[in-house]
């Protein structure tokens, strides 16, 4: 079961310091691994179509899935036919497989199933991203660009554009796993092509990114959809009653705060990221609605009661981001 980030990742506490020797080893291995690909000692797989990776240098939720949805829409607007590859975290599908319409979350993972539903786009999952991409291109030969979800550190897949999604907690205590939240050193952000900032940035991150192309993003939603498809409501319909907000995502407090700002009386129920929900997890007081994130809704639709709702959000990204991505995609040089 995935767990949310420990509190000591944001501080240099004793608990974090005790893990520093392991972080030093992690840093060495990560740096050597990347250099092997940059120097050509290990060969990255170059696909016959361009690849755009969306990721982060830290673990945890920063808003990558809404960015992938936004990116797919912008690519289509520009005349591309995109496909998506993903790790399929939490899924049990063997090898590289295509996610079918209405795929089983237990088999393919929550994020790939959600992306397939949101984008109506071909999605392939697999720990081996090049193999997943090849499977997708074989099944959908008309696909002319691949979007790699959470693929920044997957160097076996060559890429043409790198997008990093960051927020105010990205750097944390600036230490690598397991003492901190970082998968790679902070300087890695200076190498990516586009940085999308979800909300305000910390002073340390703002300083690090000074002079880099940073585009602000916020997530916005306006209606609530019943999980059985029987209707939609706006926030006004939930005012005056307690609502149980359920979130098994990297930053559940962000979801709860968004509902509170809309005037709802929220009872928060945070769960670990990628939590495998059961009906018992949603067993609250009768007559009090339950509101879920889209990522959790795909896991609960088969057993949710009639008073269970999804709150879908869309990424709104500052002007110029799409144009910069498309310029790099069509005229830029491949990124190592």
From Swiss-Prot:
Highest taxon listed in the record's lineage: Bacteria
GO function terms (MF aspect): ATP binding; tetraacyldisaccharide 4'-kinase activity
Biological pathway: Glycolipid biosynthesis; lipid IV(A) biosynthesis; lipid IV(A) from (3R)-3-hydroxytetradecanoyl-[acyl-carrier-protein] and UDP-N-acetyl-alpha-D-glucosamine: step 6/6
Catalytic activity from the UniProt record: a lipid A disaccharide + ATP = a lipid IVA + ADP + H(+)
Pfam families: LpxK
UniProt keyword terms in alphabetical order: ATP-binding, Kinase, Lipid A biosynthesis, Lipid biosynthesis, Lipid metabolism, Nucleotide-binding, Transferase
Cellular compartments per GO CC: plasma membrane
EC numbers, comma separated: 2.7.1.130
A single BP term in Gene Ontology: lipopolysaccharide core region biosynthetic process
Listed InterPro entries: LpxK, P-loop_NTPase
SUPFAM superfamilies documented for this protein: P-loop containing nucleoside triphosphate hydrolases
Binding, ATP: 58-65
Protein function: Transfers the gamma-phosphate of ATP to the 4'-position of a tetraacyldisaccharide 1-phosphate intermediate (termed DS-1-P) to form tetraacyldisaccharide 1,4'-bis-phosphate (lipid IVA).
PANTHER family: TETRAACYLDISACCHARIDE 4'-KINASE, TETRAACYLDISACCHARIDE 4'-KINASE, MITOCHONDRIAL-RELATED
Family: Belongs to the LpxK family.
Protein name per Swiss-Prot or TrEMBL: Tetraacyldisaccharide 4'-kinase
């Amino acid at each position: 079961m995935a767990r949310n980030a420990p509190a000591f990742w944001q501080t240099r506490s004793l608990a974090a310091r005790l893990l520093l020797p392991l972080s030093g080893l992690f840093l060495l291995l990560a740096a050597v691994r990347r250099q092997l690909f940059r120097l050509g000692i290990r060969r990255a797989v170059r696909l016959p179509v361009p690849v755009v990776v969306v990721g982060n240098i830290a673990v945890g939720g920063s808003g990558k899935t809404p960015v992938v949805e936004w990116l797919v829409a912008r690519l289509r607007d520009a005349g591309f036919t995109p496909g998506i590859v993903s790790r399929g975290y939490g899924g049990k599908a063997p090898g590289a497989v295509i996610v079918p319409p209405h795929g089983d979350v237990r088999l393919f993972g929550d994020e790939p199933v959600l992306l397939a539903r949101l984008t109506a786009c071909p999605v392939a999952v697999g720990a081996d991203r090049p193999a997943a991409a090849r499977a997708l291109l074989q099944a959908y030969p008309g696909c002319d660009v691949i979007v790699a979800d959470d693929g920044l550190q997957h160097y076996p897949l060559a890429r043409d554009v790198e997008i990093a999604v960051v927020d105010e907690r990205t750097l944390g205590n600036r230490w690598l796993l397991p003492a901190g939240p970082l998968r790679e050193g902070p300087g890695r952000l200076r190498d990516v092509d586009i940085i999308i900032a979800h909300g305000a940035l910390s002073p340390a991150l703002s300083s690090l990114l000074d002079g880099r192309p940073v585009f602000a993003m916020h997530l916005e939603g306006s209606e609530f959809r019943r999980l059985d498809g029987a209707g939609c409501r706006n926030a006004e319909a939930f005012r005056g009653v307690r609502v149980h907000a359920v979130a098994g995502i990297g930053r559940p407090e962000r979801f709860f705060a968004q509902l509170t700002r809309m005037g709802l009386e929220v009872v928060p129920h945070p769960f670990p990221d990628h939590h495998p929900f059961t009906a018992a997890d949603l067993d609250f007081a009768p007559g009090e609605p339950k509101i879920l994130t889209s990522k959790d809704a795909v896991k609960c639709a088969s057993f949710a009661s009639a008073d269970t709702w999804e709150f879908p959000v869309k990424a709104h990204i500052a002007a110029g981001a799409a144009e910069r991505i498309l310029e790099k995609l069509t005229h830029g040089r491949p990124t190592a």
